[in-house]
Amino acid sequence: MTDFALNAEVRSDLGKGASRRLRRNAAQVPAVIYGGDKEPQSISILAKDITKLIEDEAAFSHVITLNIAGATETVLIKALQRHPSKAAVMHADFLRVVADHKLSAVVPLHFVNAETSVGVKQQGGEVSHVISEVEVSCLPKDLPEFIEVDLAQVEVGQIVHLSNLSVPAGVELVALAHGNDLAVANIHASRVKEEGAE
């Protein structure tokens, strides 16, 4: 598991104009830390640092250490605002993490054995991904980087639901806890094969 860290500075000059100046003159991204029992804190991060961090998909489902003026905060990325036509991050929202409090986070699903599954390799079907990420609830130490969806034994016409997933100990799927056993993926008959049978 990779450790993620960012250096940040406390930001006292607030507002839309101040944020624009920060992005333009200092190549920094304005950000805010929310949550916990503390007041929201306005910070700034070097644009190149946050851009490099988010190149790794795992950064979105990992606890990140923010180094701010000699102190540290453990956070999750809650939201990113991006430029409409560039890949640049315009603003970031972080959520404070408290070690002994459960948190909710969205983690990606990694689909494995799709091409070698019974439904694809032996029955000529095609995999259809219904969702690509899922919300989990757990303690920060238990937060998974991703949840694996093994399609090896899935046949044509079968659907994989949240209840079929193997999740790490201490991790709860939020939708399932609320009685929503969502479809995750399925294998359906190939359209080419269907047309050939007509």
Swiss-Prot record:
This is Large ribosomal subunit protein bL25. HAMAP family: Ribosomal_bL25_CTC. It comes from Azotobacter vinelandii (strain DJ / ATCC BAA-1303). Part of the 50S ribosomal subunit; part of the 5S rRNA/L5/L18/L25 subcomplex. Contacts the 5S rRNA. Binds to the 5S rRNA independently of L5 and L18. NCBIfam families: bL25_bact_ctc, PRK05618.1-2, PRK05618.1-5, PRK05943.1. Belongs to the bacterial ribosomal protein bL25 family. CTC subfamily. This is one of the proteins that binds to the 5S RNA in the ribosome where it forms part of the central protuberance. One of its GO terms (molecular function) is structural constituent of ribosome. It comes from the Bacteria. Keywords: Ribonucleoprotein, Ribosomal protein, RNA-binding, rRNA-binding. Pfam families: Ribosomal_L25p, Ribosomal_TL5_C.
